[in-house]
């Protein structure tokens, strides 16, 4: 894995290699005010097939998910790894520092490699990895204790959802709201938006009319916002 920091002008101002046990498939990452959080999930290419030009993934349920906390301008020797329950995280929501803990929120897939019927069509085989209901993707929180090295983790909600966005002004800081997609059952489509309060656990749904679909949303704050949630989607 390669970790770096890019300046506002697009220049690479810091770089360090991050050794891993083998090829991995990190899709996203998150950060706090002082740290970046890397991930090593146990869903990755079958190495024996790569040489044959076949790119097939396998989920290793007996391996932990590892989250690596690195100071923003740290190096390999500064990374602190935490072992967590096995999953694959496609997208992270946010992260922040709270006392001795790094709080990390993302979407935990309870079944990263869903099964398929022997007579399934090619379309069905492909879409099982795009069906959020098959993947059982839910908002989830990890608390990484930098002092003790322990982890506390668990779901923030039982709702199946993904592709969350926050008010960008709260990135890396303690926050309250995330706006996620309402997925369609059985295929890759979004039928609305879920507004989730990560402090109280409450949710509000906005569903689109039948036959209308959306992409992940973007939050645009007002020019003089009165609160984190004061803006537009």
Q: Where is each model-derived feature located?
A:
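Beta-propeller domains
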Residues: 1-233
């Amino acid at each position: 894995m390669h970790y770096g920091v890019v300046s506002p002008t697009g220049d690479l101002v810091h770089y360090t290699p991050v050794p891993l046990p083998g090829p991995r498939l990190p899709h996203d990452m998150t950060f706090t005010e002082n740290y970046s959080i890397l991930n090593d999930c146990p869903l990755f290419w079958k190495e024996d097939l790569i040489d044959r030009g076949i790119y097939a993934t396998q989920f290793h349920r007996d391996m932990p998910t590892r989250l690596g906390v690195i100071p923003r301008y740290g190096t390999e020797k500064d990374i602190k790894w935490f072992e967590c329950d096995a999953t694959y995280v496609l997208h992270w929501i946010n992260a922040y520092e709270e006392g001795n803990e790094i709080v990390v929120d993302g979407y935990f897939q309870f079944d990263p490699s869903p099964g398929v019927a022997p007579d399934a069509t090619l379309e069905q085989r492909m879409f099982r990895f795009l069906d959020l209901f098959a993947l059982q993707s839910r908002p989830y929180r990890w608390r990484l204790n930098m002092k003790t090295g322990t982890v506390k983790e668990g779901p923030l909600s039982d709702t199946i959802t993904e592709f969350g966005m926050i008010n960008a002004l709260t990135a890396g800081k303690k926050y309250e709201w995330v706006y996620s997609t309402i997925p369609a059952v059985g295929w890759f489509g979004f039928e609305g938006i879920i507004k989730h309060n990560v402090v109280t656990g409450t949710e509000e749904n906005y569903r689109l009319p039948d036959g209308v679909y959306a992409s992940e949303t973007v939050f645009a704050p007002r020019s003089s916002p009165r609160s984190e949630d004061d803006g537009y989607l």
